Amino acid sequence: RLAAVGEQRDAQRTVQLAEGSIVNLNAFSRVDIRIDDAQRDIKLPRGEATFKVSPDPARPFRVRTPGAVVEAVGTQFNVYARPDGTTSVTVLEGKVKVTSDHGGSALPVPLAAGEEAQVLANGRIEREAHTDVAEAVVWQQRKLIFKRTSLEDMAAEFNRYNKKTRIRLEGI
């Protein structure tokens, strides 16, 4: 089965997949879902989603962004395919493996609950232990938190959520 979900600027959606997993999709995000007897494959070409994965060791659950592949069996994690080509992965419960999808023979990086990794546009994976997982999913409460973020990136993130009020930077 193949299905596409998402693309609305100001709407978050929760989707329960036929095999029991739950996808919380952020605003202006899209997932393409392919589930069959051999695989559970989710493409996240743009945006952000939290996945609560039903255990099924025979069919690993894979989320593919333009720059990374995240694999889980039964866990909960957040993935954000950023506009700059970086993919952020935060593990809320359980464990996942993160692999760069930029070619080469990069080994998977294991992450456990409370850990985060950034897969950079050049394929390098930067791992951060003991992250604040609540901040990774604050978008589900329709809130934004910025740390070490340029004003331009903050405006772009705000505009992703809001179609009535837009921020435009001039002369900066």
Predicted regions and their residues:
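A residue-level detector for the "anchor" residue at the start of short, highly conserved motifs
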Residues: 1-172
